[in-house]
Amino acid sequence: MNKKILFLSTAVILSLAFVAATSIFQAQQETKENELANNNADVVSRSGSPSKGAADAKITIVEFFDPACETCAQFYPLVNDIIKKYPGKVKVEMRHTPFHKGADKVVAMLEAAHLQGKFWPALKLLFANQQGWTRHHTAQPEQALQLLSSLAIDKQQLQTDMVSEKVANVISQDVADAKTLEVRATPQFFVNGKPLTRFGYRELIDMVEDAIALAY
């Protein structure tokens, strides 16, 4: 009996120690991420990035995303819902972070579509049909391009812009900013320059609503 009590006591102590250590680690990570964003506030958002919502909205959600990312596709309608729920108060800005193999060519398509004012229709189409142009977490650019051909878009201009220096520079800047901010996975969200340190849709909503309460 004494051995059983000793075993249980030891297990409880170890469990509590693990929980405490995990909490401390999470707190340290959150502090680090916030300090990193504060020290590099000028690279979180970039003028000219695709955006949706009122231009004068006081709340800006910046999303570093990969079009081949399944979680990004799942969050796409959820972020749209936030913008609709708070009209005029919230906008979203998209930053390219092509982590998946082959995604670099797909983000070039999106940026080329952006030059024609078709970024959002293109992104919606790609996310809605993501399983058709990705294989085992690898993007298939040819299939993605074929899909985008169904849009009312200048296809020849799209293909020209895809490989242009202008598009390449935008993507390079986004990737460099993501590296500076130590974005390691997508989607990564920032709300008014502050990182979402605990990932989740409910956590994102809470952060946005807190920002709205402060701004309005």
Regions found by a protein language model. Give the residues of each.
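Ser/Thr/Pro/Gly-rich low-complexity linker/stalk segments immediately outside membranes or between
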Residues: 26-40
